[in-house]
């Protein structure tokens, strides 16, 4: 049964009928490999893992029955591989967002959760912060020792805040999307909404049939140009936001987003012009 009537448009169809991945008693080698792949996919944000990067020692302990799936998840989350992908070079709020997504399968509900983990990280370090997710009653009640963490924010569950449904779609950008391959890079996705206690808009992921890649800059980006047009339905104005324009006069690194206001009748021509400059169009919305 679909999570919502718009499951295909929101990119959640892959999770509609998929049961949780669990390592059951009397498992086969194929079952074990399925669990290991699921852990890497979930905990590493669907980022590609080379054979040389796999945690062979932790996999061996799981294979020999020395550790549980929960402990294997802990080993991956504390590994240098995880730190290189999601800790180093990321804003700390972004790290916390990803920890919630990877380890508890949801987004932070409010700023108090972020503050708790910021304090824990500052006072006790990264490993202690990871332990606080995996040893929490929420993790135990949701996954126990043998179930691989999965995205729970798409469904209504006991103790879940309604705003969590909106928030998860700022972190989840499609089944095939990687947490390291998004236009916003290392910036926090939820800091502003959490600070203002505001529910964000649910925007379909970039791989759906009706959505462009979604990007919200850390500070509001004013339009660089507004092209005049006629009034009326055909003259509706759209806001095009782009990154990576390779021309003199445009920011190359620090301010990666540039916005244009374009009337409907000029929209197609303007998009083609921008693409010829090497720009990546990251959102097109009515102004």
From Swiss-Prot:
Any one GO BP annotation for this protein: photosynthesis
PROSITE patterns: CPCD_LIKE (PS51441), PBS_LINKER (PS51445)
Membrane topology of this protein: Peripheral membrane protein
Keyword annotations from UniProtKB, A to Z: Antenna complex, Membrane, Photosynthesis, Phycobilisome, Thylakoid
Any single Pfam family the record assigns to this protein: PBS_linker_poly
Residue ranges of domain CpcD-like in the record: 235-287
Annotated source species: Thermosynechococcus vestitus (strain NIES-2133 / IAM M-273 / BP-1)
Entry protein name: Phycobilisome 32.1 kDa linker polypeptide, phycocyanin-associated, rod
Signal peptide start and end residues: none
Cellular component, GO annotation: phycobilisome; plasma membrane-derived thylakoid membrane
């Amino acid at each position: 049964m679909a999570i919502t009537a718009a499951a295909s448009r929101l990119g959640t169809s892959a999770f509609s009928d998929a049961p949780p991945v669990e390592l059951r008693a009397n498992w086969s080698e194929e079952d074990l490999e399925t669990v290991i792949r699921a852990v890497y996919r979930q905990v590493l944000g669907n980022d590609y893992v080379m054979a040389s990067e796999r945690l062979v020692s932790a996999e061996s302990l799981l294979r020999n029955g020395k550790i549980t799936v929960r402990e294997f998840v802990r080993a991956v989350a504390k590994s240098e591989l995880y730190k290189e992908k999601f800790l180093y070079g990321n804003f700390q709020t972004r790290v916390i967002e990803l920890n919630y997504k990877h380890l508890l399968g949801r987004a932070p509900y409010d700023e108090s959760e972020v503050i708790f983990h910021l304090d824990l990280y500052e006072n006790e370090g990264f490993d202690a912060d990871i332990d606080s997710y995996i040893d929490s009653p929420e993790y135990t009640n949701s996954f126990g020792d043998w179930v691989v963490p999965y995205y729970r924010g798409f469904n209504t569950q006991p103790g879940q805040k309604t705003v969590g449904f909106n928030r998860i779609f700022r972190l989840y950008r499609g089944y095939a999307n990687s947490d390291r391959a998004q236009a916003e890079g290392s910036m926090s996705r939820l800091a502003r909404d959490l600070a203002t206690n505001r529910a964000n808009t649910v925007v379909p992921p970039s791989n759906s049939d009706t959505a462009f890649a979604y990007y919200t800059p850390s500070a509001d980006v004013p339009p660089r140009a507004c092209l005049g047009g006629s009034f009326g339905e055909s003259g509706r104005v759209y806001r095009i936001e782009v990154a990576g324009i390779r021309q003199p006069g445009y920011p190359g690194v620090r301010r990666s987003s540039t916005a244009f206001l374009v009337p409907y009748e000029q929209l197609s021509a303007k998009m083609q012009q921008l693409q010829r400059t090497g720009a990546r169009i990251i959102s097109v919305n009515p102004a």
